[in-house]
């Protein structure tokens, strides 16, 4: 999919660059593969904001995407490629030989009419899924599982991918887009290819209203708030915050290391921060 730029006939169209989605399916999604979504406005069960800058936006139906790909050795044909409002990647509707329909993440270079299959060892072809134990080293993959059978969790956003770079005692080594080198069990599944819609990050939405349609609210600076709302808030007139930049909860926000270590850190061979100064 290419980018589409617009002539500045209105202020909202000046600088507007969007993805050309003319080749995608224009109808509604498959009814049995969608469910309703209730808007939370970024609040949790106690009513507190746990995710800032969320709220409003157009109504959505959630498309149930198969991230597990555990239907082994049953070929499926791609019926159509669809837009999914819940993610940056496109999704593909596939029909298995036994008649079952499913949505999968659409990789780059997957077209309508192509055949995909999941199995213990399959062809290295976009859309095919297999565990790392049956995969040749050097393969570009996406939708990578962290735990066998849990479903893909890594490399699912538009244009992302990981590279299978080696094996080591029951583990597969993968290099992620961020530069991180990590291990996962060889029984973990991954899908061949890079995720579709690589130009997603090159879009320019042109006006605030388009982001509001997507459910994104304005970002307010801490120094513009009251003292109750943010450590940088308050003061007479404009202030610089009066302290080193912090988050609303008082943690350093300009590079201070604040993350706790966790058990799975031992599976990270090289951190994505390895090249940073002082790391």
Curated annotation (Swiss-Prot):
Q: Which residue ranges does UniProt annotate as crossing the membrane?
A: none
Keywords for this protein? Ribonucleoprotein, Ribosomal protein, RNA-binding, rRNA-binding
Top-rank taxon: Bacteria
Q: What processes in GO biological process is this protein linked to?
A: cytoplasmic translation
Summarize subunit and interaction data from the UniProt record for this chain.
Part of the 50S ribosomal subunit. Forms a bridge to the 30S subunit in the 70S ribosome.
PROSITE patterns for this protein: RIBOSOMAL_L2
What does the entry list under GO cellular component? Answer: large ribosomal subunit
Q: Which PANTHER family match?
A: LARGE RIBOSOMAL SUBUNIT PROTEIN UL2M, RIBOSOMAL PROTEIN L2
Q: Name the gene.
A: rplB
Native organism is Cereibacter sphaeroides (strain ATCC 17025 / ATH 2.4.3) (Rhodobacter sphaeroides)
Region (Disordered) spans which residues?
Answer: 224-279
Q: Which family does it belong to?
A: Belongs to the universal ribosomal protein uL2 family.
Q: Where is the composition biased (Basic residues)?
A: 269-279
Name this polypeptide is given: Large ribosomal subunit protein uL2
Matching Pfam families, A to Z? Ribosomal_L2, Ribosomal_L2_C
InterPro entries associated with the record: NA-bd_OB-fold, Rib_uL2_dom2, Ribosomal_uL2, Ribosomal_uL2_bac/org-type, Ribosomal_uL2_C, Ribosomal_uL2_CS, Ribosomal_uL2_dom3, Ribosomal_uL2_RNA-bd_dom
């Amino acid at each position: 999919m290419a980018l589409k730029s617009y002539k500045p006939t209105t202020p909202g169209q000046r600088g507007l660059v969007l993805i050309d989605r003319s080749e995608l399916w224009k109808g509604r999604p498959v009814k049995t593969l969608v469910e309703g979504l209730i808007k939370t406005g970024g609040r949790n069960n106690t009513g507190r904001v746990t995710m800032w800058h969320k709220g409003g936006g157009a109504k959505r139906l959630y498309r149930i995407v198969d991230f597990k790909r555990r239907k082994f050795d049953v070929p499926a044909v791609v019926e159509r490629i669809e837009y999914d409002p819940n993610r940056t990647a496109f999704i593909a509707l596939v029909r298995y030989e036994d008649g079952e329909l499913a949505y999968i993440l659409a990789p780059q270079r997957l077209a309508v009419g192509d055949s995909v299959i999941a199995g213990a060892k399959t062809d290295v072809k976009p859309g095919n899924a297999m565990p790392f134990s049956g995969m040749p080293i050097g393969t570009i993959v996406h939708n990578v599982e962290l735990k066998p059978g849990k479903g893909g969790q890594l490399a699912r956003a538009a244009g992302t991918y990981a590279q299978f770079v080696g094996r080591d005692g029951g583990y597969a080594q993968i290099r992620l887009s961020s530069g991180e080198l990590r291990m996962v069990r060889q029984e973990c599944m991954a899908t061949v290819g890079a995720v579709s819609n690589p130009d997603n990050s090159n879009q320019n939405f042109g006006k605030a209203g388009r982001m509001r349609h997507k459910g994104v609210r304005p970002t307010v600076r801490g120094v513009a708030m009251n003292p109750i709302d943010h450590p940088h808030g308050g003061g007479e007139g404009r202030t610089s915050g009066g302290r080193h930049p912090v988050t609303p909860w008082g943690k350093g926000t300009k590079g201070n290391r604040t993350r706790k270590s966790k058990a799975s850190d031992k599976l990270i061979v090289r951190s994505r921060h390895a090249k940073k100064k002082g790391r």
